[in-house]
Amino acid sequence: MELNVKTLEGKDAGKVSLSDAIFGLEPREDILARVIRWQLAKKQQGTHKAKGRAEVSRTGAKMYKQKGTGRARHHSARAPQFRGGGKAHGPVVRSHEHDLPKKVRALGLRHALSAKIKADDVIVIDNLVATEAKTKALASAFETLGLTNALFIGGAELDGNFKLAAQNIPNIDVLPIQGINVYDIVRRGKLVLSKAAVEALEERFK
């Protein structure tokens, strides 16, 4: 398939050919869901913690004698049923990360790209380069292109001026091609690829 290439000023800059093996798949929501769940699980902190009965600061002595009081049998006041006692089966510090095969991760990226193409939400820009690091000027260019919620993917090296100018614009993300991922593609409305990014994707999946 072919897409029109535009400049940041909104002018035509030719066409680019896209591989059907990368951009022409029938999107599968289950694959996308698996990859996004894997990404978010990796990011989750897992610093939650509650003290168990072995960790609370309290005497471990038996509360009162076993027999003769007429009361229920108890040992330590650290037990979970008492105020100030330890939590039974409470949260512990752990990693929420789980494994996902590389083939599924790669397939998820291709399905995310295909989903954006199918929704007509992909724009190819010839070059993501700004002459100066001015947010106002870049925001005006984005408005001309109708980009209010978008992910920009550049080549291996991002233009410093473009990155600086874009980082303060709401709902706009800028990543190098190495950072392209399913979650960021799906969470933004439009996907904007530079010609260098398209070439890198073709090379990666050939």
Curated annotation (Swiss-Prot):
GO biological process: translation
InterPro entries: Ribosomal_uL4, Ribosomal_uL4-like, Ribosomal_uL4_dom_sf
Residue ranges of the TM segments: none
Region annotated Disordered, chain positions: 63-97
Coiled-coil spans in chain: none
Positions with biased composition (Basic residues): 64-77
Residues in the signal sequence: none
GO cellular component, one term: ribosome
Keyword line: Ribonucleoprotein, Ribosomal protein, RNA-binding, rRNA-binding
An example Gene Ontology molecular-function term: rRNA binding
Pfam families according to UniProt: Ribosomal_L4
Xref: NCBIfam families: rplD_bact
Entry function: One of the primary rRNA binding proteins, this protein initially binds near the 5'-end of the 23S rRNA. It is important during the early stages of 50S assembly. It makes multiple contacts with different domains of the 23S rRNA in the assembled 50S subunit and ribosome. Forms part of the polypeptide exit tunnel.
Assembly mode: Part of the 50S ribosomal subunit.
Family from the record: Belongs to the universal ribosomal protein uL4 family.
Protein's UniProt name: Large ribosomal subunit protein uL4
Source species of the chain: Rhizobium etli (strain CIAT 652)
Gene that produces this protein: rplD
